[in-house]
A protein has these predicted regions:
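A short, flexible loop at the N-terminus of ABC-type nucleotide-binding domains that lies
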Residues: 1-7, 13-26, 76
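Conserved ABC ATPase "signature" region
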Residues: 103, 107, 114-132
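A short, proline-enriched helix->beta-strand linker immediately N-terminal to the Walker B motif
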Residues: 155-159
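Catalytic Walker B motif of ABC-type/P-loop ATPase nucleotide-binding domains
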Residues: 161-165
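ABC ATPase "signature
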Residues: 220-221
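Short, charged/small-residue-rich alpha-helical element at the C-terminal edge
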Residues: 232-304
Length: 313
């Protein structure tokens, strides 16, 4: 396996106004080349800090990171030539229009004019920005501005792309256009390190994922591996006149609008589903989603904040 990013024992402590924050407490990660790797975790977990270190914008307090075999601390120049970054907070150059933003970015990276023009045209169509090509970046809506940043980076020929929440604030259609663009980048044998709070997105795009919590890697693996690593990997949604007490023997129960949600092991999940069907209650059984896993591992107990669970039976 070719490695795009190899991090060992990476720590980072921020010091400001006499206060110390340990943002990374020892991160080991191996990101294979030619695939999308997802970093997920709660706000403040350390994802952006890791991306800034691996993309040579921030020095680690200790540990090492190599990108495509080049040391990010000792040899940042070699790394910078081969990567492109969408930072979490980005302010594109406001006096340019959308076309210029993308085209000049590619030129600045050393791409010949003809190639830069061809790629700019293609990415503007791909991300539905073509009709806005002459619009000043400062006149774009927030989501369109974000798309323009995504366009710049995806049109580049960088081998490793660091995308820190590229789809935050995008409408559902635009989000899927970005997914397609990321998938195309992977077909071109590039590597994407992605952070996102949309766990359906993390699951749809990533070959592997790391769940970061408190500056450490809590879990790492393929989405399926991660989903199977919780004690109760199935979710059963039951509607109808069933009490919490009746459901408790089957697993972990949460009351949701119109019914109950039970997280259970496979056997119990099947049994409960059969029983509910026999009684004529609407029921559905499915593997736990990545979001379920996330909530079970790093969230509050299920049910405390589960507003989306309605009408899924
Ligand atoms: N410049 C800074 N100075 C001091 N503390 C910082 C700085 N940047 C980040 N931190 C702290 O480091 C920790 C990790 O932050 P980081 O931005 O890496 O988290 P994140 O996982 O990207 O979160 P989010 O999902 O909200 O983007 C947090 O506790 C944050 O407050
Ligand atoms: Mg962040």
């Amino acid at each position: 396996m070719e490695e795009a990013i190899r991090a060992r024992g990476v720590t980072r402590t921020y010091r400001s106004k006499g206060r110390e924050t340990v943002a990374l407490a020892g991160i080991d990660l191996t990101v294979p080349a030619g695939a999308t790797y997802g970093l997920i975790g709660r706000n403040g977990a350390g994802k952006t800090t890791f991306i800034r270190i691996a993309s040579t914008q921030l020095l680690p307090t200790s540990g090492s990171v190599a990108v495509l075999g080049h040391d990010a601390v000792a040899d940042p120049r070699s790394v910078r030539n081969r990567i492109a970054v969408i930072p979490q907070e980005s302010r594109p150059l406001y006096f340019l229009n959308v076309y210029e933003l993308v085209y000049l970015y590619l030129k600045l990276r050393g791409m010949p004019g003809t190639e830069a023009r061809r790629r700019t045209e293609a990415v503007l169509v791909e991300l539905s920005l073509d009709s806005r090509r002459k619009t000043l970046v400062s006149h774009l809506s927030g989501g369109m501005r974000r798309r323009a940043m995504v366009a710049m980076v995806l049109a580049s020929d960088a081998e490793v792309l660091f995308l820190d929440e590229p789809t935050t604030g995008l409408d559902p259609v635009a989000r899927r256009e970005v997914w397609s663009a990321i998938e195309r980048a992977i077909r071109d044998r590039r590597t994407v390190l992605l952070t996102t709070h949309y766990l359906d997105e993390a699951e749809a795009l990533s070959s592997r994922l790391a769940l970061i919590e408190g500056g450490r890697v809590l879990l790492e693996g393929t989405p399926a591996e991660i989903r199977s690593r919780i004690p109760r990997p199935f979710r059963v949604s039951v509607q109808g006149r069933v009490t919490r007490e009746e459901l408790l023997p089957y697993g972990e129960v949460a009351e949701v609008r119109g019914g109950h949600l039970v997280f259970a092991r496979e056997e119990e999940a099947r049994e409960l589903t059969r029983l509910a069907l026999a009684k004529g209650f609407p029921v559905s059984m499915a593997p736990a989603s990545l979001e379920d896993v996330f909530l079970q591992l790093v969230g509050r107990p299920i049910g405390e904040d589960d507003p989306e669970e309605e009408g899924t039976a």
